Amino acid sequence: MGADLISPGLRALIVEDETLIAEELRERLSRLGFTIIAAVDSAEEGIAIATRERPDLVLMDIRLKGGKDGVEAAKEIRQQVDVPIVYLTAYSDRATVDRARKTEYDGYILKPFRRDELQSTIEVALQRHAIRAKRKKQ
């Protein structure tokens, strides 16, 4: 898996309020061949950019700056853009996971995460999205 799923030039949006993590994600995704369209720290910015730019992947922290959290942002993005969303969070409590599940996310990674874990989760997210898109066309 991977080589045909993560093709060079796929566009990613990072929505993460911790600067060091956002930079690490930017670096890791770039190494995987992604073009980073933006790294923002609020749900509102993430929604605006995802709606305007229509990325191929969104990495979304759950706790963010601003009035909305990542789950709310993902829900709004999903209503407007068909894009795989991978949550990155330090929160694994039942309530958070249940809220996130309702947005039909494509991946959920607990921080801190390993490089291979990030890559495999992204590969699965892209594959799930491709299968969903194919089913919609049928």
Language-model segments: what does each one mean?
Residues 1-13, 126-138:
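Non-catalytic signal-transmission and effector/linker regions of two-component phosphorelay proteins
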Residues 9, 54-56, 79-86:
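His-Asp phosphorelay/catalytic-motif detector in bacterial-type signaling
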Residues 10, 18-38, 43-44:
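Two-component/phosphorelay signaling modules centered on CheY-like receiver
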Residues 42-45, 66-72:
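Acidic catalytic/metal-coordinating carboxylates
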Residues 61-62, 89:
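Active-site residues of response regulator receiver
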Residues 68, 72, 79, 86, ...:
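Alpha4 helix (beta4-alpha4-beta5 surface) of REC/receiver domains from two-component response regulators
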Residues 95, 113-123, 130:
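C-terminal output helix
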